[in-house]
Design a protein with these regions (language model features):
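RNA pseudouridine synthases
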Residues: 1-183
Length: 183
């Protein structure tokens, strides 16, 4: 959920007031999140006790799809730039993102209402874009949309491989006993 860190707990004093995944469910002791979502992002997060599964999902073989609500009415030219790859900063260096799939969503996606209001229409239009990546640098989607002049206001991961968020509600934890990936 929005406002949670993609870790189960922390012993850090500066993170004492943060929210952690461990507050949502009694996960096994050796559970790990597969990939991360930053505190201001939300959506599908897989959790496993299998390190090989985690490595596979985090590999460049598995697509991750995000819906990004951006500031302004995103243009066809901006979408084309996303598709080709854009320059972002990563670890203090310039990095060109790999080509990706990107499309402007004509309709507002059916997502749960976020607990913290984003803004209202007095500040200008917003639009939604679907971005499908198979890499995942630190805050990559946010940096990509900002680099093309349309900063991200809300970011939701809606798919990892063939696994979709569907009608899950904020904070839902769905246990899967017999899990097979078909990639």
């Amino acid at each position: 959920p929005y406002g949670y860190l993609s870790q189960f707990h922390s012993n850090s004093k500066k993170e004492q007031k943060k929210k952690f995944l461990g507050e949502l469910f009694n996960f096994p002791k050796n559970a790990m999140s597969v990939g991360r979502l930053d505190e201001k992002s939300e959506g599908l997060l897989l959790i496993t006790t299998d390190g090989k599964f985690s490595d596979f999902i985090n590999s460049k073989k598995v697509d991750k799809e995000y819906y990004a609500q951006v500031d302004g009415d995103i243009t066809t030219e901006a979408i084309d730039r996303l598709k080709k790859g854009v320059e972002i900063g990563f670890n203090g260096k310039k990095y060109i993102t790999k080509p990706c799939k990107a499309v402007k969503l004509e309709n507002i996606p059916d997502l749960p209402i976020r607990t913290k209001k984003i803004r209202d229409n007095r500040h200008g239009p917003t639009s939604w874009v679907s971005i499908i990546l198979n890499e995942g640098k630190y805050r990559q989607v946010r940096k990509m949309t900002s680099a093309i002049g349309f900063p991200t206001l809300r970011l939701v991961r809606v798919r990892v491989g063939t696994i979709k968020i569907g009608k899950m509600k904020v904070g839902d934890v769905v246990k899967v006993d017999d899990f097979k990936l078909d990639f």
